[in-house]
Amino acid sequence: WLGRYGFLRSEGQATVGDVLRGKTGAVPPFVHTHPTETVRDAIDILREFGVSQMPVVRAEPPVMAAEVVGSVVERALLDDLFNGRAQLADAVDAHMSPALPMVGAGEPVQAAVDALHDADAVIVLEDGKPEGVVTRQDLLGYLTA
């Protein structure tokens, strides 16, 4: 439990936090949206930062893990929009996907690899607070750096 929420650090091996800190580029570490924002707003955020998924949180960061209420995934939004199940003016909470898996910053990189088996991204927690998002692309970048 302590490791999963980022309170403990694995000794002697690369950690998920190392991957997060090694990310390059101009993307803020915790791109997010809120349940009351519109689908259009969420799409604008996805496009602005060039990400394909992001957490939905109840408050402005810093937030605790329990305040992550879901995620926005471009694939799901595109499907809902094209099939008439969503409108651009709808609130995000009506179309959000389940929350992204969470891994502790101090956990070994393998924990992120395992979590990414069934998800496109994971939220990295440090002391119980979401600090950022790591994707498969981030892991590949870390491994080749």
Q: What function would you assign to each model-found segment?
A:
Residues 1-145:
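Tandem CBS (Cystathionine beta-synthase) repeat/Bateman regulatory domains
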